[in-house]
Amino acid sequence: MPTITSYFCLLLAALTLTLALFIGLSKRQLI
């Protein structure tokens, strides 16, 4: 099912982006 794969890929991308943003903010506050 391409729809499920597409949805999973989008969810994974969103999770990675959120995690990267959180790490970036943490590093910025740490300095």
UniProtKB/Swiss-Prot annotation:
InterPro entries: Cyt_b6/f_cplx_su6. Coiled coil: none annotated. Keywords: Electron transport, Membrane, Photosynthesis, Plastid, Thylakoid, Transmembrane, Transmembrane helix, Transport. The chain crosses the membrane at residues 4-24. It holds the Pfam family PetL. GO terms for biological process: photosynthesis. The keyword Protease does not apply. SUPFAM superfamilies: PetL subunit of the cytochrome b6f complex (SSF103436). The keyword Membrane applies. It is found in: Plastid thylakoid membrane. GO terms for molecular function: electron transporter, transferring electrons within cytochrome b6/f complex of photosystem II activity. One of its GO terms (cellular component) is plastid thylakoid membrane. It is a single-pass membrane protein. HAMAP family: Cytb6_f_PetL. Component of the cytochrome b6-f complex, which mediates electron transfer between photosystem II (PSII) and photosystem I (PSI), cyclic electron flow around PSI, and state transitions. PetL is important for photoautotrophic growth as well as for electron transfer efficiency and stability of the cytochrome b6-f complex. Belongs to the PetL family. The 4 large subunits of the cytochrome b6-f complex are cytochrome b6, subunit IV (17 kDa polypeptide, PetD), cytochrome f and the Rieske protein, while the 4 small subunits are PetG, PetL, PetM and PetN. The complex functions as a dimer. This is Cytochrome b6-f complex subunit 6. The gene is petL.
